[in-house]
Amino acid sequence: MWFKNLTLYRFNKPFAVETEALETALADFTFSPCSSQDVSKFGFSNALGKKGSSLVHSADNRHLICVTKEEKILPGQVIKEALEEKVALIEDEENRKMAKKEKDALKDEIITSLLPRAFSRRSQTHALILPELEMILVDSSSATKTEELLALLRKALGSLPVIPLSFKAPVESNLTEWLKLGSAPLPFEMQDEAELKSEADEGGIVRFKQQDLKEDEVLAHLATGKQVHKLALHFGQSIALLLQSDASVKRLKFSEEFRAGNDEVGTDDPMARLDADFALMGSELVALMHALVAALGGLEEAQV
């Protein structure tokens, strides 16, 4: 359940859907496994996984939701070889060349015949709805997975007025300034990883890892006009993260010391522990968002 990535969106209008109403809305789009002829299935699943019993898990007016996607695995090469074999057989038997339309229809038949025997894979994506911040945080670095979740949530609710988080000044300008100064605004602390890009169309990209970012070698690239597009940071003693110029966060990691804050809850009651962990994570992500918005100079005015 602990988030590992953050793609950030904000609501254009206050999110005023209560837990019970949200649960009811999502229930119409509950995940069900693929049947023998389904290529993929997608829907909402228990927010807290197998041990959970609801599609929405709420605490302190913060709502955790989850979508599950199941996809049949049909290797393209397998389909290609089966199609070529069938086409060759038909063309030999009938002494003619098959038209493209016939080949396409034959390909569909092959896929249909293979589906019942195909393996499948499942993936899950969580999101945290934060009405107090008018934000929704998606635990994914994939634009496709994020959009799929938001599209299904929009379908369930009828509307979902959200836009990507944007700031008054470009994020890369702030990151570049922090690197020049040799420090990030508190409670953030720069670490030893950064990616710099030239703003020129054919400019280069320089990546530093496990290196002191205050060294002249690093700063020399700023003098040539490169800007910082990725920067590793610590948020206090609780979170390590990689902040990107599109305001997304990768490699989000809660420290062991922070997660140990719920050790007194124990593990005898798994649901109690999951609930406590969710409350702990939610409160710290709210604190992170407040600090991030302040450090980056404030949000751009939302267009209603």
From Swiss-Prot:
Single annotated GO MF: double-stranded DNA binding
One GO term of the biological process aspect: regulation of DNA recombination
Keywords: Cytoplasm, DNA recombination
Main localization (coarse): cytoplasm
Entry superkingdom: Bacteria
Cellular component GO terms, alphabetical: bacterial nucleoid; cytoplasm
Entry's localization field: Cytoplasm, Nucleoid
InterPro entries reported for this sequence: RdgC
Spans through the membrane: none
Record function comment: May be involved in recombination.
Similarity remark: Belongs to the RdgC family.
Listed name of the protein: Recombination-associated protein RdgC
